[in-house]
Amino acid sequence: MDDLRDTLMAYGCIAIRAGDFNGLNDFLEQECGTRLHVAWPERCFIQLRSRSALGPFVGKMGTVCSQGAYVCCQEYLHPFGFVEGPGFMRYQLIVLIGQRGGIYCYDDLRDCVYELAPTMKDFLRNGFRHRDHFHTMRDYQRPMVQYDDYWNAVMLYRGDVESLSAEVTKRGYASYTIDDPFDECPDTHFAFWTHNTEVMKFKETSFSVVRAGGSIQTMELMIRTVPRITCYHQLLGALGHEVPERKEFLVRQYVLVDTFGVVYGYDPAMDAVYRLAEDVVMFTCVMGKKGHRNHRFSGRREAIVRLEKTPTCQHPKKTPDPMIMFDEDDDDELSLPRNVMTHEEAESRLYDAITENLMHCVKLVTTDSPLATHLWPQELQALCDSPALSLCTDDVEGVRQKLRARTGSLHHFELSYRFHDEDPETYMGFLWDIPSCDRCVRRRRFKVCDVGRRHIIPGAANGMPPLTPPHVYMNN
């Protein structure tokens, strides 16, 4: 639809039928083939389709839409079209709406669901920005930091992590202000690593379970990350907030790169490793957003082998009125530039982000969410030891006991540990075995995670329990 009013009306017709999937399908059959503009990326459209006209996705519809196999709240979903645009195959990206009005996207190539927005109104503003793989495509990349010779040199090495590390060691410390126009990244700065504390001291927050208010040693950091990354990797820098007057950098997450060029974040408040980006170029476009709020939902095995952060549930408890999408905002919702934030405001922002993550993980465990099985034992232990646990619950001891009951044994993650089935691999070997193949790394990760939680995770935990049959007839 070329007319903006007609496009908005079409989106509105979809939104108001979110609770009536059969009525929605009738509407889609009438409008089948209509193309709707999206807010982002440009040159992409949604072609409306009924549930029987979505090609190969029809055979996957039951699993994705009505068995709760992806979305944490096990929400019923209904497709309403697929994405057309440069670089995408037909039916690769299926757009879905939840029973409570949330907008999602199923990626057929990666077999995962992205939560795009909690409401249609938010989707009209954000488009597909929460589908992070868009940021791996050159046509859609917009860096959040100013490129210079340092960045250009680092990005040249890609999977050559030794040369990349040597480049960082040679050039030393440099910090960059993060420019996030959508204000989704809690960090104000990224800084390349240096061991020289006279130039800059990397300091952890008081919520850290590693070195609360202090500085971690590089070797200690590697000892904590090796059992989960399970291949050769190096420290690139840190995300957080720079305080030049004190020559301190307050760290929210350390940034690491593995031998495949994949970028990870180490969170000292959760003793957790999160996948941040597929490569350094993508990292410059998303920075620490995936390590703050991850919008990708996938099966347990895939989430573990990719080291995906447990997704943050943004689904509203009550179904919002879909007509609010036509209301005008009270303000332009534009954030103040980051450089006007005081140090106190920036630090408070970091602490709020850390607290939000801790509360999210505690809620997963206390509500027995299937996503709680995605947490590594180290994360559960960190929650037990967290000085901020009292901010997450009133029943601190009760929650702590439940966390400990789910933690399993951490001795499986010591560097000297060898697998019970006489596998000759050791974690020390994971640090130095160059080269390694992606398949081996994925196998190792799933194996070591399940060894640590073997006695507390039932065999069926790799998938969510099926829901009761939905109120729609999927064979229509």
From Swiss-Prot:
UniProt family annotation: Belongs to the herpesviridae US22 family.
Pfam families per UniProt: US22
InterPro entries from the UniProt entry: US22-like
Protein's UniProt name: Uncharacterized protein UL36
